[in-house]
Amino acid sequence: MDRLQEALAQCGRLVIDGSMSTALEHLGCKLNDKLWTARVLAEHPEYVKEVHLQYLRAGADCHITCSYQATVPGLLENGFTAPEAAEIIRRSVRVFREAREEWWEREGGRESGRVYPIGLAGIGPYGAYLSDGSEYVGRYGVDDETLRAFHESRIRLLLEEKPDYLLFETMPSFREVLIAAELAEKSGADYWVSFSCLDGKHICEGDEIRQCAETLSKGHPHLKVIGVNCVKPQFVESLIHELKAGCDLPVIAYPNSGETWEPVQKIWYGGAEKVSFGEHARRYYAAGAAAIGGCCTTVDFHIRQVAEVRRAFAG
């Protein structure tokens, strides 16, 4: 029984953390930068650790490292040397590990009755490196070898720090997911996959998510979880049903709070959903999701709502 199975056996349902970027902004960090959260990881890792601690205290069981935008080519293009880039990427796993141990040993985590927190090494798509909103579109215009080289270097560096799982997240392209899965399978590492989606049935490049789940779940023994993230809350119930119809893997969802992303100015606009995030979580768990969390524009407040719903749901 692996870490995920143990946690699900203990709790029935799990809670994923919330947005790293929004929480960092609330701490005063400026993120209008091509490296986005990776700039903070490089220059002020203490803020990243504080965000992890906030989500640990809020009740999250599964935590994503601050490595979504931390890529070797991106760091090199922004003035870091190759050794510095490698260190920054590896640091993302260590910073979470430090926060986890501090919470577990010094803040009562061990006595809380909660599961030992799961660390997910976050890996964003090629579109995140482009920093132009392509993670919501796909169709990058590059060949398979370019995608393979892009993902291989970061996978290798993250695995040197032995995270619990790799997490390929906000993936708009099924072709890219298959390449990433091939690399993870070759490494022998267990991994999760989470898609960005157009609507309640299709990933951003237009493929039916049910078919993606059906295809991906065959011949990939190290794939442990499939899900969606960075999507509008109103699409999630349908997406959960589609994923569950396509495979037997645990399904996760961590949507945005409801705003829309503007990639040029790098801002979110529009009001958040009037329905509470906790009420959304209740419906997602009822639809069969194994774990729920938040993506962009969510903070520890939202995750506390999810954790409260999970407790009631499990009870």
Predicted regions mapped to residue ranges:
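Domain-level signal for soluble alpha/beta catalytic cores
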Residues: 1-315
